[in-house]
Amino acid sequence: MGKLIMSIDQRLQLIMRNTAEVITIDELRKKLESDEKLKGYIGFEPSGLFHIGWLIWTQKVKDLVEAGINMTLLRAAWHAWINDKLGGDMNLIKMAADYAVEVIKNYGVDVGKLNIVDADDIVKEKDYWALVIKVAKNASLARIKRALTIMGRRAEEAEIDASKLIYPAMQVSDIFYLDLDIALGGTDQRKAHMLARDVAEKMGKKKIVSIHTPLLVGLQGGQRMNITEGMEEDDIQAEIKMSKSKPESAIFVNDSREDVERKIMGAYCPKGVAENNPILQILKYIIFPRYNFVKIERDIKYGGDVEFKDYEELERTYIEGKIHPMDLKKTTARKLNEILEPIRKSLEKKPEFEEMIQKISKSVTR
């Protein structure tokens, strides 16, 4: 039986599902209506262990491939090195890139349909560095410094070393060099994508559509320990998001079933509260996209099992106080472990990754 052909509206709906924003929807529709083979990408820093927050953009890569977008996965080792990841150990950074691709494959993305590119190959090209300089010439120093939040750093941290100032221009140059129609990233990449759109007009380059996925809040949820008045939204998101540098705030794809259960059961999940609730976010962005429905299993004296066909219905019921946090957590742990099991099994079969995981665990930087 042949593969079903999706309409423009169906492709648009799939691409936009569970996104925080698309800049702009009209431009995306026009690109889809052009009937051209569209090129998209996501660049990722191989910077440590793969936590479940990354599964949000991994699912979106899967959606984009299904929607007929020719997706490139950029293994941004040089960017990770500039950003002082894994102690600047380039060999370890490259091992982390291999590990990430293995995770993406075992999550269910058809990596055979991805164009996997190493930053190593791009930076060897003299045309690339000429592009970096041209991008920098078309952006103010203040604009570049404001874009440092794409690295998980604040603008005032630009004084650490001068290489950090090259990073935003490199990311914009990646987009131009790969001749892309679509750039995918978390909401923390918004400033780089907006810079690319603005500079494109000045340089006569193709203006990308930028697709931003939400950042998964850490397991501490809305308990904002380091939030101060006057902080930009980017900095606030950086403080509360799930992060490799805060291991107890994160669930890693190679965590054991027991560790996943322990972390979920200890997570922030106040009764009837949806805002910054990590358990509800895991259900919305990771579990529901993989299943047609979710069953909350309960003892008959507490109302018995209840099924939900969409996230909105579940959230509404939770806010009304009709689902106990403990029942929600048990279901989340069970379904999340189902998703992570094939990833864990694959990693266990490759001893080189076990050694690398041990090294990375000792070397994780911000």
UniProtKB/Swiss-Prot annotation:
Keyword vocabulary terms for this entry: Aminoacyl-tRNA synthetase, ATP-binding, Cytoplasm, Ligase, Nucleotide-binding, Protein biosynthesis
Gene Ontology BP, a term: tyrosyl-tRNA aminoacylation
Single GO term (MF): ATP binding
EC primary class: ligase
Main subcellular location: cytoplasm
UniProt key word Nucleotide-binding: yes
Catalytic activity: tRNA(Tyr) + L-tyrosine + ATP = L-tyrosyl-tRNA(Tyr) + AMP + diphosphate + H(+)
GO cellular component, one term: cytoplasm
Domain of life (superkingdom): Archaea
Motif segment ('KMSKS' region): 241-245
Binding site for ATP: 244
Transmembrane annotation, as ranges: none
EC number, UniProt record: 6.1.1.1
InterPro entries assigned to the protein according to its UniProt record, in alphabetical order: aa-tRNA-synth_Ic, Rossmann-like_a/b/a_fold, Tyr-tRNA-ligase, Tyr-tRNA-ligase_4, Tyr-tRNA-ligase_arc/euk-type, Tyr-tRNA_synthase
Residues annotated for L-tyrosine binding in this entry: 41, 167, 171, 174, 189
Compartments, record wording: Cytoplasm
Subunit architecture: Homodimer.
Family: Belongs to the class-I aminoacyl-tRNA synthetase family. TyrS type 4 subfamily.
NCBIfam families membership: PRK08560.1, tyrS
Role of this protein: Catalyzes the attachment of tyrosine to tRNA(Tyr) in a two-step reaction: tyrosine is first activated by ATP to form Tyr-AMP and then transferred to the acceptor end of tRNA(Tyr).
Protein name according to UniProt: Tyrosine--tRNA ligase
Native source organism of the sequence: Saccharolobus solfataricus (strain ATCC 35092 / DSM 1617 / JCM 11322 / P2)
